[in-house]
Amino acid sequence: MPMKSLRNDHGTLKAMIGSDFNELTIAAKNLATHAFTLTGLGFGTSVLEWVASIAAIYLLVLDRTNWKTNMLTSLLIPYIFFSLPSLIFGIFRGEIGKWIAFVAVVVQLFFPKHAREYLELPVALVLLAVVAPNLIAGTFRDSWIGLAICLGIGCYLLQEHIRASGGFRNAFTKANGISNTVGIICLVVFPVWALIF
């Protein structure tokens, strides 16, 4: 259609501009919907990462107090290593972690009677974060391999906890079983969510 005839036909011009604006509106809505969906999934994964790390630390502390469990809590150290949020992991991997590791080694070497048994696993976590090669601390930790390790540890701990409680029902009815069961379920939910989404 020649330009001169378009200038005279305002109805066609309005229809074309209206059509373009409708297409832009639909594209903007799709962009907003997709951005919200992706951000929402990322936000959910981030929140679950924090919840799983806090649950693992809670279970680690719980085992070192009077509420002893039959869990193999040393497995929580690699779980925390692979699921710790990047902000905290970066702190432990940096200068602060090096100083904590240095003080822990000095205390263990020169004052072995003052080094408490309940500090062994947290110090092992900091040492692991400080000395782990970049392949493990960066590549494996931020990939599906780290999530698969977390999922394996979480499933194993859940199975052992249910077995030690005497069944699935007893895991929720014993006095301290509820908190342990909910904590271990959090350990399983995070890697499943992160692997799916």
UniProtKB/Swiss-Prot annotation:
UniProt record, GO biological process: cellular response to water deprivation; cold acclimation; response to abscisic acid
Keyword Transmembrane: yes
Keywords per UniProt: Membrane, Transmembrane, Transmembrane helix
Induction conditions: Accumulates in response to abscisic acid (ABA), freezing and drought treatments.
Ranges of the Cytoplasmic topological domain: 62-71, 116-117, 163-176
Subcellular location: Membrane
Record-annotated membrane-spanning stretches: 41-61, 72-92, 95-115, 118-138, 142-162, 177-197
A cellular component term, taken from the record's GO annotations: plant-type vacuole
Statement: the UniProt record of this protein carries the keyword Transmembrane: yes
Extracellular face residues: 1-40, 93-94, 139-141
Membrane topology, from the record: Multi-pass membrane protein
Alphabetical list of PANTHER family matching this protein: COLD-REGULATED 413 PLASMA MEMBRANE PROTEIN 1-RELATED, COLD-REGULATED 413 PLASMA MEMBRANE PROTEIN 2
Family the UniProt entry places it in: Belongs to the Cold-regulated 413 protein family.
UniProt-recorded name of the protein: Cold-regulated 413 plasma membrane protein 1
